[in-house]
Amino acid sequence: MRRLLSSAALTLSFLAGQSADAASNDALLGDFFPYRDFQTLPSTRIDVEGGALEVAFAPGNLELPKATILEWVSRSARAVANYFGRLPDAQAKLLIVPVEGRGVRGGTTYGTRGAASRIVFGRATTEDQLTRDWILVHELVHHGFPNVGSQHHWLEEGLATYVEPIARAQAGELSAQMVWRDLVRGLPKGLPQAGDQGLDHTPTWGRIYWGGALFYLLADIEIRRHTENRRGLQHALRAIVSAGGSIARDWPVEKVLATGDAGTETRVLQDLYRKMKAAPGDVDLADLWRQLGVSMDGGSVSFDESAPLAEIRRAITAVAR
């Protein structure tokens, strides 16, 4: 199944009026991952805990040295492997396709013949832009969750939206303040609107990405409450990966949630899913931030370490034991 970022649908438009190299990349930017063509491209193997990521570049010039780009890929892959306890797919693939412009322009992840991600990469991208990029980690997080079908797409995209900044924070690439700032800004977009029928039945952009992320934040908090903060969502996801779950596998949603719950010895994922799948499940975010001890003034986040859930908040971005 194809996984798209909101910006990824724009990637084909970059081909219009491009050079011969860009035109030759048509087949590499289609609706499916070019598994066969990928094998014909020069590639580099990046070894990561639990496997390796094979990285190939489509034809086209890039201003940054490939060694710099590969170091960015390596950092991103290590952040994801650290979060899941290992690389979710031991033989994952990454295709980098140059286009005009700057920055990482979009990403797509597939599981048809193994976990594979494609990144659309501006030729004039700077090293600073790579340092601040979130898209590659978002795509690689998708590798660690089974394909559960279009009705449950919010479980897939919500997971990548929630886990990406936390994985980067645990790897030392992002501050805890930035993680919570983005959640405070983003989660209101995932709240139910008039006519909402629950996450399984309201496939809007806000509900798929940020409604899904809210589900996982609530699950993370509840798992930690049930286990006296010894375990969290991260342990549930590691259990799914340890059981063979990845984007290259089709699993019923019931199996995914039950496997995750087994990893925390709770029923939080299954119970929360039943609560939110077919009903709006509105959440008082202002009260949630108060309990977590998170407040934002302008663009700056501060923490109240005496808040009821401050210890849980700290544990979410700390390296898992």
Positions of PLM-derived features:
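Bacterial N-terminal signal peptides
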Residues: 7-16
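Structured beta-strand-rich cores of soluble
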Residues: 23-47, 75
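Juxtacatalytic substrate-recognition/specificity segment
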Residues: 45-148, 152
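Acidic/His/Gly-enriched intrinsically disordered linker/tail segments
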Residues: 151-220, 225-227, 233, 242-247
